């Protein structure tokens, strides 16, 4: 029996993941602002202004939707380790930027059409590379 290769609607998958992240954030940290969707909208508007099109535009939109894909993963791990942590005030920027490193590992499992390496990893990095992600990674 011949088995057809699995066809994945990557845009639909990214949208579903984004909605799932919204639900988890609302449940875990009571955040209901749809941050990923706003970042994606602004990113796509800027990309269109810069004449980015096709696969590159689609991949940019997906990265923007999923840029914080590991934030809730990281926060839930911290809460399990330190149950008395005040989630909104008790996590330092340096510690929360670990989600960039976790997110980079998660995102490599998605078959993008263009090179998206480092988009998730460095989304909190400063222009002078003096941010906490580079310091944490090194």
Feature annotation, model-predicted:
Residues 2-138:
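Histidine- and acidic-residue-rich, metal-dependent catalytic cores
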């Amino acid at each position: 029996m011949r088995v057809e290769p699995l066809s994945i609607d990557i845009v639909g998958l990214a949208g579903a993941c984004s909605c799932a992240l919204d639900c988890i954030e609302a449940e875990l940290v009571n955040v209901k602002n749809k941050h990923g969707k706003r970042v994606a909208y602004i990113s796509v508007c800027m990309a269109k202004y810069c004449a980015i099109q096709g696969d590159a535009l689609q991949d940019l939109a997906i990265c923007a939707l999923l840029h914080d894909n590991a934030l809730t993963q990281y926060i839930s791990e911290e809460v399990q380790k330190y149950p008395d942590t005040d989630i909104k005030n008790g996590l330092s920027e340096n510690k929360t930027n670990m989600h960039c490193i976790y997110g980079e590992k998660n995102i490599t499992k998605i078959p993008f059409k263009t090179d998206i390496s480092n988009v998730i990893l460095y989304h909190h990095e400063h222009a002078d590379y003096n941010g906490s992600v580079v310091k944490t990674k090194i």
